[in-house]
Amino acid sequence: MQISNFGTFQKFWSQFSSRIGKKESYDAKRFQQLISSYRRFPLRAEPARNDGNFSTPPMRDFDKQLISSGRRSASWGWGSNGNALRPASGRGDDKEPNFNLEVPPNGYAWWYIDGVEPNTGQAVSIIAFIGSVFSPWYKWSGRKKPQNNVCLNIATYGKKGRFAMTDRGDSALIQEAHKLTIGPSSLTWDQTEKKLVIEIDEISSLPFISKLKGTITLKPTGITDVELPLTKEGTHVWRPFAPTAEIDVDLNKPEWQWTGHGYFDANFGTRALEQDFDYWTWGRFPLKTGTSCFYYLELRNKKQYQFGFHFESDGT
């Protein structure tokens, strides 16, 4: 996922809504062209296709230079030794996720899960938002109350992939230490089995408007105890809970019952992303010995930072 140039979303939304209002027929290619006409459009998910063929969106070219690496430091220190990770603290999630945290005005919290079936290439991503950073309504509201813009975003990739992202108000949100409920969907951390259970009950968007329902279970091989502050002030934090995991997908669509490799992280912030970042992107790469991750940042002050980390299967 890459995030930047957030103002373009409002322009895109007005054009797309206008086309829907005129009852123009939906065409995935036209929709993709509309998206690609905006530089660094914030949503990277492609329109769903029914032929099983997905073209990879063009990625940005980066200068070839050494990526910092390292494990952790006691404080924020992006030094030449690359020791940027620090012990996770302040949210009660150093050993397991805690969904019952306070998200301040102008802030956000999201929990991200993805998984890939290595043989077919099918994939899924889920993001649970409090203070949805993709929501134009959250921005238009002045970001006064993050709890009033919550959603569970799910995207499936492969034959007849689906996309769902319904913005809901605070009445749809229930926060408990080990369970996050957003409308009819929920994330539950099973303390006994040490696994994350995601119950999905959503409606997918164009072109396949239909009920998207089922259960996705993520079983980490280990939980890390570290986080990466993305700014010196700590206004944005990346918390890689389970870089290595097994995932079981059971959705109410033909051929959408599979297992594969998974991933689980979270991001927390006390300021809007566009206040501090021009651009960021990240990636995770499963290996025999665990998972390697990279993080690339461009701050509003034009400084650039690159990080690379390897996490063993047990989270160390």
Describe the role of every protein-language-model region:
Residues 2, 15, 19, 23-25, ...:
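A cross-taxon signal for low-complexity, glycine/charged-rich
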